[in-house]
């Protein structure tokens, strides 16, 4: 199993190109199922989760051509509506094929998903909403069997809790439903807006983008289009955090500063100089040790839970102390024991972590537990004294494209070992 060997103590400097967002690419790939003519998706990141979903969609009989950063799909060859456990088990996002398959073909059989071990993340919100649209759903032997007679019917749906995947699944189902569907308490993440914009390019009628109420007027069919995946705001924030923790200066390009304001505000509070351009962000820590800053994770546009672990890592070597409150996912402090092994001073009390900054971290063998937590260990290793070995880095490969090449280009001493 691959590991990262990182030698700390290098101030990162340079420029890094940001990839397309994994969290946008996955629903956009699922939405290709809805197109009745060829469709092209550009700026697709080369990641394990993306490859898995492309494989899953190809397994439905759809012709998939994946080359470089471009995926082309032709749904005219579809032969079945079955998403098997072997592919679904590694990734939660595979449940996103449920809505499009059901809406377009009236039938879907999808295994219950796997993916990161963060909290319960139940799919019951997806299923309840699909039933409201007229679907008949049975869950047996670990599979969701969904059918509908004729077309799905528009409905007024209110999610019990904010669910990104649920919003995406129902949005994709509603675009081909008969009549109007109103989705209330919808998630407002930029990746959902990206999905809605591609669906509109395909001929869908959607109002209320960037709000918590989406109104969808169903159409009979959607056509293909050419579309580009939005920049990855979490990858952007992660590389800026690498500059902050090492006292360096990093410019991220091919990104969108407007999607990351809550995080950039925190970097500025830490003492960094942040410069924004139209499609770039530069963070200069000017060799200083960052100031520890408190924050609370909340749904977009507030501070994203997917940046919690990275900002905690920066706080670990910060001046002073900070309280970090995680309100989105339970069980999302799994990186704390690993950071503590490197000398971090962190106390966890329920959904709060109290971080008292230390001047130095020591290298230690550590283990990645989930996607974002694993990047926090990379950040800590970049400033630790000595050589840190990070195990289970397959978690990192699920969400960061060419991570070692990108970090090496900034001066980091990182290599992949087995």
Curated annotation (Swiss-Prot):
UniProt-recorded name of the protein: UDP-N-acetylglucosamine 1-carboxyvinyltransferase
Q: Known EC number(s)? A: 2.5.1.7
Superkingdom of this protein's organism: Bacteria
Q: Which gene encodes it?
A: murA
Per its record, the protein catalyses: phosphoenolpyruvate + UDP-N-acetyl-alpha-D-glucosamine = UDP-N-acetyl-3-O-(1-carboxyvinyl)-alpha-D-glucosamine + phosphate
Q: Where in the cell is it found?
A: Cytoplasm
Please name the SUPFAM superfamilies in this protein's record.
Answer: EPT/RTPC-like (SSF55205)
Pathway, per UniProt?
Cell wall biogenesis; peptidoglycan biosynthesis
Cross-referenced HAMAP family: MurA (MF_00111)
Q: Which Gene3D superfamilies match?
A: Enolpyruvate transferase domain
């Amino acid at each position: 199993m691959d590991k990262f060997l990182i030698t700390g103590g290098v101030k990162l400097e340079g420029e890094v190109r940001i990839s397309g967002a994994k969290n946008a690419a996955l629903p956009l790939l699922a939405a290709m199922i809805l197109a009745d003519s060829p469709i092209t998706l550009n700026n697709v990141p080369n990641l394990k989760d993306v490859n898995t979903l492309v494989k899953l969609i190809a397994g439905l009989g759809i012709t998939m051509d994946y080359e470089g950063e471009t995926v082309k799909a032709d749904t005219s060859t579809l032969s079945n509506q079955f998403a098997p456990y072997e592919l679904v088990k590694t990734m939660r996002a595979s449940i996103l094929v449920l809505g499009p398959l059901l809406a377009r073909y009236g039938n879907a059989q999808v295994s219950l998903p796997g993916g990161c071990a963060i909290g319960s993340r139940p799919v019951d919100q997806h299923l309840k909403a699909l039933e409201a649209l007229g679907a008949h759903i049975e869950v047996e032997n670990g599979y969701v069997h969904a059918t509908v007679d004729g077309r799905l019917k528009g409905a007024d749906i209110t999610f019990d809790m904010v669910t990104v995947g649920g919003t995406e699944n129902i949005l994709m189902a509603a675009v081909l439903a008969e009549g109007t569907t109103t989705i209330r308490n919808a998630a407002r993440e930029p990746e959902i807006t990206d999905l809605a914009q591609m669906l509109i390019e395909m001929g869908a009628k959607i109002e209320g983008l960037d709000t918590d109420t989406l109104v969808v007027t169903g159409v009979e069919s959607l056509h293909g289009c050419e579309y580009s995946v939005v920049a990855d705001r979490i990858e952007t924030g992660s590389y800026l955090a690498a500059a902050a923790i090492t006292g360096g200066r990093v410019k991220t390009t091919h990104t969108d500063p407007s999607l990351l304001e809550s995080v950039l505000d925190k970097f500025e509070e830490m003492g960094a100089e942040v410069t924004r351009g139209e499609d770039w962000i530069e963070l200069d820590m000017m060799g200083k040790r960052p100031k520890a800053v408190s924050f609370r994770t909340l749904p977009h546009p507030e501070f994203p839970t997917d940046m919690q672990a990275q900002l905690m890592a920066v706080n670990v070597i910060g001046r002073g102390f900070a309280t970090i409150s995680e309100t989105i996912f339970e069980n999302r402090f799994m990186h704390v024991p690993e950071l503590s092994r490197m000398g971090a001073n962190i106390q966890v009390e329920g959904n709060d972590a109290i971080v008292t900054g230390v001047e130095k971290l020591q290298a230690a063998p550590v283990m990645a537990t989930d996607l974002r937590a694993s990047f926090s260990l990379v950040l800590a290793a970049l400033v630790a004294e000595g050589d840190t070995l990070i195990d289970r880095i397959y978690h990192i490969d699920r969400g960061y494209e060419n991570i070692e090449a990108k970090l090496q280009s900034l001066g980091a001493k990182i290599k992949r070992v087995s």
